[in-house]
Amino acid sequence: LGDLEMMLSCPNGDSIIVFNSFGGTGIGPAFAGGFNGGGTYLGDALDDGTSNPGIGWTYNFSDTLADWGTMATEHGLGNTLPTTLSPGQGMNPDSIYLPEQTFDDLIGCPVNGTWKLTIRDNLAVDNGYIFDWAIFFNPYINPNFESYTSTIVDAQWHDGNSVNDPAVTSFG
């Protein structure tokens, strides 16, 4: 956590800092400040000098559903758990955190388009993995439930000696 910065950008270029734990030097921080979260991992990291991933945990960020404060606040309070893969280290609990800058700063952004998650690792002494990421929008943005049903017009199966023989299906 100590050398990481994370930013979310919407299609028109507006952005917020999700967290900024890097407060030192290295390749140079992308954002000013940082809470110096060194020695704390996100997930159960395998810090043995290899490039093998550890065990990914789920970290969510929400202005309204957060169980915890910002990662900076929780780090300052010492709210960490012991790691199992790298004994003697601590990791942030998997939970829902407040972002450092409110998602309200993205009001007015177009929903359609490319949303970008920028994560910067400022020190080359370790590695990191993103196991999964997603973004969910408030359903009130588009309250019209949209669904569709495909109707099979014609379907055929062609027997053959291989499981890779094609099946032909037409939808209408």
Residue ranges and their predicted role:
Residues 1-150:
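Loop and turn regions of beta-sandwich accessory domains that flank beta-strands and are enriched
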Residues 155-172:
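Surface-exposed, flexible coil segments in extracellular/virion-facing regions
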